[in-house]
Amino acid sequence: MFDSKNLVNPHLAGDSFFEKRSSKGILLLHGLTATTNSVRPLASRLGKLDWTISAPLLHGHGESLEKLSTTNWRDWATQVEQCWHQLNDHCDESFIAGESAGGLLALWLACLQTIRPKGVVLVAPALQLNLPDWKRQLIWLLSFFKSTFPKENKSVDLQWQGYSEHSLKAVLQLIDLQDLVLEIIPQLEQDILVVEGGQDDVIGPGVSTLLQKKAKGSEVKSIFVEKAGHHPMLERTSQDYVLPEIVNFLQKS
């Protein structure tokens, strides 16, 4: 259990976990300000199919916003890389799935690692934020004067776990990672599944179209769920459809 002063739904399970089973495995990556709670529904389904699961709690998460503000995207990437090698020490076939910022880290890893994932699942990937340029500039300016700003929707009813506020510096790190990933996407060679929600107010529309244009070496499959928001794997309106589709993609890849 985490510190209730920092997190929404601190009673939920959100720590790192590694579940060693068969030689088929997957690395699951949560989003910015979240915890591993957001990927546990998928982990549960794959675990029943005897998959090995690795799900790290990214640096600066599950502790405090102050701690998150001292981390950068390279800290997260290094941690993800270490977990990827650990997974591949045990597995013959390895995949990766990421939600939101975790999707960016999944793309970074898929492009640059010598041992590349057999398939990539991106759930509401933060490739393009629903954030105009003037807001980006405002975030950069505000980061010199304050460290956090509140979220409009704290997701209490969603069974989502994470910080109730944004770290301005962490958002800027996310944008830096986003810019890098957009440059290296043409290096992708794996099959990709993209899950997008029609009610997602965080991610800009057309992520799957963007990937299809840039990742010409990959086959990109898209699932669009009109009623889904930014957390399709947790939302009751979408999870019963989205989770089986993800599992089906992974089993066939």
Regions found by a protein language model. Name each.
Residues 33-43:
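The serine-hydrolase catalytic nucleophile loop
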Residues 47-65:
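Conserved alpha/beta-hydrolase
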Residues 98-102, 106:
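Gly/Ala-rich beta-loop-alpha elbow adjacent to hydrolase catalytic centers
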Residues 121-130:
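Active-site nucleophile loop of the alpha/beta-hydrolase fold
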Residues 167-185:
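Active-site nucleophile elbow and catalytic-triad environment of alpha/beta-hydrolase enzymes
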Residues 188, 194-196, 200:
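Short beta-strand/loop motif that positions the catalytic acidic residue
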Residues 201-207:
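Conserved alpha/beta-hydrolase "acid-adjacent" motif
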Residues 228-239:
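Catalytic histidine-centered segment of alpha/beta-hydrolase-like enzymes
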